[in-house]
Every structure is written in structure tokens, then in C-alpha cells.
Design a protein with these regions (language model features):
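N-terminal membrane-targeting hydrophobic helices
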Residues: 1-166
Length: 166
């Protein structure tokens, strides 16, 4: 069974999950849609939509690069803001890392600076974890300062009446 799209969607959602609480579900869309859509380049390169043809390329297309992910993230950031731009970059980067972690066709992650190659699952896990940690940091950095109500600060669970003046 061909499960790559499901795997890419789940990984993209996972690396931006810390952003959802503060920024809404739109960040999931900003991560998952590009992480799925990028594989259209396989059909273009193979000139076919058959799974056997698109998965048997000698190397993955050049759009499967960090440069492509950075470009897409920058475009989305300019259009919708930095959080959604990061989500787009992180979703695409998780896709590239997953592809570069397998033993299939080499992935041009560092194109045009280095030839296409595979990174292995250990590096995929480490770098995907770094994306998750960066999303957590961004979530905290964009959070509004937290303030507790006066009654909660008084230690009575918020049941106290407002403070009285003389």
C-alpha cells in the first residue's frame, strides 16, 4: 500500500502542532497542503501519474530542496505573516527530510550547493525534532504575555469579590 501522502501529512502536522493553540488550525493547512502538493513534481518529472512511475525516478526533482522550502515559506510569510510562513517551510522541510531518510531515490535537499543524496533515518529524526522545537519556540515567542486575574492571584480560586477601596 502506498502511504507516502499520509506519512507526509502526519509529519507536517506534527512539526507545527505547537503553533495550533495560539495561531489556530490554519497553520496545519499552511504546513500540510504544501507537504502534499510538492509531490506533483514527481508526476511532472515522470510524465505520468502512475505510482510505479513516480516512485521509480532515478533522483527526486530539484523542487525537493531546502531552497524551494525557503522560497515557499518566504512567499507565504509575505502574504500571510511569519507564523504561516514558518508552517509552510516546516511542512515542506519535514517532507524533504522524510524523503531523504529513506533508501529510495536520492533527494536534492541542499541543491544547488550539494548533489542529491540520502541522509538516513537518524538525521531525519534529529532534524525533524529540530523543526518541532523551533515551532515550540515560535509559539512561545508569539504568545501574548500571560496575566492572571487579581482574584486568582489571591489564592481563592477566583471566587473573591473585587478589591475594595477605602
Amino acid at each position: 500500500m502506498y502511504s507516502d501522502p499520509l506519512q507526509h501529512a502526519c509529519l507536517a502536522a506534527a512539526v507545527v502542532a505547537p503553533l495550533v493553540r495560539r495561531s489556530g488550525r490554519g497553520v496545519l493547512v499552511a504546513a500540510v497542503v504544501p507537504a502534499l502538493a510538492i509531490d506533483v513534481d514527481h508526476a511532472v518529472a515522470a510524465r505520468s501519474v502512475r505510482v510505479g512511475d513516480i516512485t521509480s525516478l532515478a533522483t527526486r526533482p530539484r523542487t525537493h530542496s531546502a531552497l524551494g522550502a525557503l522560497g515557499a515559506g518566504a512567499v507565504v510569510a509575505a502574504a500571510t505573516g511569519p507564523v504561516h510562513g514558518w508552517a509552510t517551510f516546516a511542512g515542506l522541510a519535514s517532507h524533504l527530510l522524510h524523503d531523504a531518510g529513506d533508501r529510495a531515490a536520492p533527494t536534492p535537499v541542499l541543491w544547488p550547493f550539494a548533489p542529491a543524496r540520502q541522509l538516513g533515518r537518524a538525521r531525519q529524526l534529529a532534524l525533524s525534532s529540530a523543526l518541532l522545537i523551533a515551532s515550540l519556540a515560535l509559539s512561545r515567542a508569539t504568545a501574548a504575555p500571560w496575566t492572571e486575574p487579581l482574584s486568582a492571584a489571591a489564592g481563592d480560586g477566583g471566587a473573591a469579590s473585587p478589591p475594595r477601596t477605602a
